[in-house]
Regions:
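Juxtamembrane helix-loop junctions of ABC transporter transmembrane domains
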Residues: 3-13, 36-37, 41-53, 57, ...
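An intracellular "coupling" helix at the cytosolic face of ABC transporter transmembrane type-1 domains
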Residues: 21, 25, 117-121, 134-143, ...
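Transmembrane helices of ABC transporter permease
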Residues: 26, 30-43, 81, 145-199, ...
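Helix-loop-helix
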Residues: 63-66, 163-177, 251-320, 325-326
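Membrane-integrated ABC transporters
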Residues: 1-45, 60, 64-74, 89-93, ...
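Transmembrane helix-loop-helix hairpins at lipid-water interfaces of multipass membrane proteins
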Residues: 13, 31-85, 165-170, 268, ...
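Alpha-helical segments in transporter systems
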Residues: 18, 29-50, 54, 71, ...
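ABC-type nucleotide-binding domain
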Residues: 341-631
Length: 631
C-alpha cells in the first residue's frame, strides 16, 4: 500500500531550513551579496526622512528655492538608486537559485533510483512527484525572497527604530509598544500555520496521485465507465485541499491585520503626541515630519512579517518533506556494507570478480528465506527453505499456483529485494557481496508486466545493455519476433509514448523480452515472458528463444505447458517452498499438484485436490495434454 503521509519529528523552522545549507553553500557569495545590496537599498529609504527634515527645517522655512530644488534632486537620486539596487539583487539570485533547485531535484531523482523496492512499494508516486516539483518550488521561492527580506527587513526595522529613538525617544517608545503583542501573535500564527501548510502539501501529493493514476489508467477508466467515480475522488481531494488553503488564508489574513493595525495605532498615538509637542515648542516641525516619514518607511517591513513567516513555514515544511525521502537509507552494496552510492567506486577499486566471459553460469539458492521488510518478525515468510541448483547452461522452469512466490523468488536474483536468510550464489559467489551494478550486468530480467519508457523502440531495447553492438539490436528483435518494429513509421526510432501504450500488450512484451536478451546475459530471469502472445507468435518466439537459452543459465516462470517445454528441468513452488524438482515428464507422473497445474484444471477444479504438494502418489485421473508429446 502506498504511503501518502509520513510522521516526522517536529523541528523548528530554522533547524529545518538549515538543512538546505549543503545545497546553498556553492552560491553563498551571490546570496550574501544580494542581501547586502538589499540592505543598502532599504537603508536608502531611511535616508529620505532625514532629507525631508533638512528641507522642512531649512530651505522650506527659509523660503530657499534653490535648497528646495536641491533636496528634490537628492530625493530623486535616492529613489532611482533604490530601484536599481533592488533590480540588481534580483539578477544576483535568479540564476544561482534556479541552479540550487535543479541540483536538489537531480539529487532527489538519483536518490530515488538507489532506494530499495520496499520503499517504492509503500510510497505513492504522486507524493514523490509533489516533493520534486511543488516542494522544491517553495524552497526556491523562500531562498529568493523571504530569506533575504527577513534579514533585510529585520535590519531595516532595527536601524529605523534606532533613528526614531535618536530623533525623539518619547515618540519612539510609543512605536515600540506593539512589539510584545505582535511577538505573541506571530508565535501563535507560526504554530497553527505549520500544521495547515503540512496538511496542504500532503494533500497536493494525494491529488497528484489521483491525477496520475487516472491518466495512466485512462483505458480502464473509460472501458469500465468509471469517469464519474474518478471525478468524485478528484473533487473530494480537491475540496479538502481547498478547505485547507482557506484555513491558511484565514490565518494569514488574521496575522496581516494584526501587524497592520497595531503599528498603525502606535503611529496614530505618536502623531497626536508629536503634534502636542510641536504646539508646545518642544519639538520642531521638521523633526516631526522626519519622525513620521521614518515610521511610514518602516510600515512595509513590519507589515510583511506575516507573509514572510508564512512563506518560511511553507518552505520549512517543504524541506522536511524533501528530506523525508532523502533520509531513507539507499540499498547497500552488501548487507551492513556501503550504500549503493559507493557501489560504483567500490566496483572500480575492488578486484573484479565473476568476469562475464569467464563465468560458468551456475546459480544456487541455499536455504533462502524471504519476508517483506514491513512484515511482522513472527509472520510466515513468503519464501522458506528454498534450496535449488541451476546447472551451467541449464534452463529451470518455476511452476506454481497463484501466490506461491514465483515472482518474488525471481526478484531476489537481481537483488530487487534482499533475502531474509540464506544466500543466492552465482558460480559460488554470494550475490550479496557483489556490487549491484556488477550483478545486474550479469543477470538480465524480463518481467511479466512489461514496462516501456517514453523513448524510441531502439532506446527501450538497448536499456538491456550499455555495450550492445548495432547487430545485437537486430538479433534481439529477431529472438523476440518483434519484426513489427520495421513496420512502424520510423522503425526503431519510433517513439513508443508513455508506458508504451501506443503498442499492443503482446508488442510491449516482445520488446521487453528483446531488452532482456540484447546484452547476451550470462544469467537470464524471465517472469512468464510469453503470457501476452498469441499461439502462433508464441511458437515463433519459443523457437528463437531456445537458441538463446543454450548460451545462458535461465530461470523461467512458466504458467503454460508450452513454456515449460523450454526448460531442462522444472521446480514446483508451493506455498513458498520447493515441493519437487525434476523433468516435466517426471513431475507429471509423480506429482499430483504439478499434473493438476499443467492440465489447466486450476481454473475449473477445487485446488484442495492438489493439497498434497510434493506427493509422489500418481494421479491417473489427471493427464496432461503434453505428456504423450514429451521425449
Amino acid at each position: 500500500m502506498s504511503t501518502s503521509h509520513v510522521a516526522t519529528k517536529d523541528q523548528s523552522v530554522v533547524r529545518s531550513l538549515l538543512r538546505l545549507w549543503p545545497y546553498v553553500r556553492p552560491v553563498r557569495v551571490r546570496l550574501f551579496s544580494a542581501a547586502v545590496v538589499a540592505i543598502v537599498a532599504s537603508c536608502m529609504s531611511l535616508v529620505i526622512p532625514l532629507v525631508l527634515k533638512w528641507m522642512v527645517d531649512g530651505p522650506v522655512s527659509d523660503r530657499d528655492t534653490g535648497g528646495i530644488w536641491l533636496g528634490a534632486f537628492v530625493l530623486l537620486i535616492l529613489g532611482i538608486a533604490e530601484a536599481i539596487l533592488f533590480g540588481f539583487r534580483r539578477w544576483l539570485v535568479a540564476r544561482p537559485l534556479a541552479g540550487v533547485e535543479a541540483r536538489m531535484r537531480a539529487a532527489l531523482f538519483a536518490h530515488l533510483q538507489r532506494l530499495p523496492m520496499a520503499f517504492h512499494d509503500r510510497w505513492a508516486s504522486g507524493q514523490l512527484l509533489s516533493r520534486g516539483t511543488t516542494d522544491l518550488m517553495l524552497v526556491r521561492m523562500f531562498l529568493a525572497f523571504p530569506l533575504t527580506f527577513l534579514l533585510v527587513n529585520g535590519t531595516t526595522i532595527l536601524v529605523g527604530f534606532i533613528i526614531l529613538l535618536w530623533q525623539e525617544w518619547t515618540l519612539g517608545l510609543v512605536l515600540l509598544a506593539p512589539i510584545v503583542p505582535l511577538f505573541i501573535l506571530c508565535s501563535y500564527f507560526e504554530s497553527r500555520y505549520s500544521v495547515a501548510a503540512r496538511q496542504a502539501q500532503d494533500q497536493v501529493g494525494d491529488l497528484t496521485t489521483v491525477v496520475e493514476e487516472s491518466v495512466l489508467g485512462i483505458r480502464i477508466v473509460k472501458g469500465f465507465g468509471r469517469n464519474r467515480s474518478q471525478a468524485r475522488a478528484f473533487h473530494e481531494l480537491a475540496r479538502k485541499l481547498r478547505g485547507t488553503e482557506l484555513v491558511k488564508a484565514r490565518l494569514l489574513a488574521g496575522i496581516w491585520a494584526a501587524v497592520t493595525v497595531l503599528p498603525e495605532i502606535a503611529v496614530g498615538g505618536a502623531l497626536v503626541l508629536g503634534t502636542v509637542q510641536v504646539a508646545d515648542g518642544a519639538l520642531s516641525a521638521g523633526t516631526l515630519v522626519a519622525f513620521l516619514s521614518t515610521a511610514l518607511a518602516l510600515r512595509w517591513p513590519v507589515e510583511s512579517i506575516g507573509f514572510l513567516l508564512a512563506m518560511s513555514q511553507e518552505a520549512a515544511t517543504a524541506t522536511n518533506r524533501y528530506f523525508e525521502v532523502m533520509d531513507v537509507e539507499p540499498e547497500s552494496a552488501t548487507p551492513g556494507g556501503p550504500t549503493e552510492q559507493d557501489d560504483t567506486s567500490a566496483a572500480a577499486t575492488a578486484k573484479p570478480s565473476l568476469d562475464k566471459a569467464a563465468t560458468k553460469g551456475e546459480m544456487r539458492f541455499e536455504g533462502v528465506e524471504f519476508r517483506y521488510p514491513d512484515a511482522a518478525p513472527d509472520s510466515v515468510p513468503v519464501l522458506a527453505r528454498i534450496d535449488l541448483a541451476v546447472r551451467p547452461g541449464e534452463t529451470m522452469a518455476l511452476v506454481g499456483g497463484t501466490g506461491s512466490g514465483k515472482t518474488t523468488l525471481t526478484a531476489l536474483v537481481p537483488r530487487l529485494h534482499e533475502v531474509t536468510a540464506g544466500r543466492i550464489t552465482l558460480d559460488g559467489e554470494d550475490i550479496a557481496r557483489l556490487p549491484r551494478e556488477r550483478l545486474r550486468s550479469l543477470v538480465s530480467v524480463a518481467f511479466e508486466e512489461p514496462t516501456l519508457f517514453s523513448a524510441t523502440v531502439a532506446e527501450n531495447v538497448l536499456m538491456g545493455s550499455d555495450a550492445a553492438a548495432p547487430g545485437d539490436l537486430e538479433r534481439a528483435l529477431d529472438v523476440a519476433q518483434a519484426s513489427f518494429v520495421h513496420a512502424l513509421p520510423q522503425g526503431g526510432d519510433t517513439e513508443v509514448g508513455e508506458q508504451g501504450l501506443s503498442l499492443s500488450g503482446g508488442q510491449r512484451q516482445r520488446l521487453a523480452l528483446a531488452r532482456a536478451v540484447v546484452g547476451r546475459p550470462r544469467f537470464l530471469v524471465l517472469d512468464d515472458p510469453l503470457s501476452a502472445l498469441d499461439v502462433h507468435t508464441e511458437a515463433l518466439v519459443e523457437a528463437a528463444l531456445r537458441q538463446v537459452l543454450k548460451e545462458t543459465t535461465a530461470l523461467v516462470v512458466a504458467h503454460r505447458p508450452s513454456t515449460v517445454l523450454l526448460a531442462d528441468r522444472v521446480a514446483l513452488l508451493s506455498q513458498g517452498r520447493i515441493a519437487a524438482v525434476g523433468t516435466h515428464q517426471e513431475l507429471l507422473r509423480t506429482n499430483a499438484e504439478y499434473a493438476w497445474l499443467m492440465s489447466g484444471a486450476e481454473t475449473t477444479t477445487d485446488p484442495e485436490r492438489a493439497s498434497g504438494a510434493g506427493s509422489t502418489v500418481p494421479a491417473p485421473a489427471v493427464e496432461s495434454p503434453l505428456e504423450g508429446n514429451v521425449r
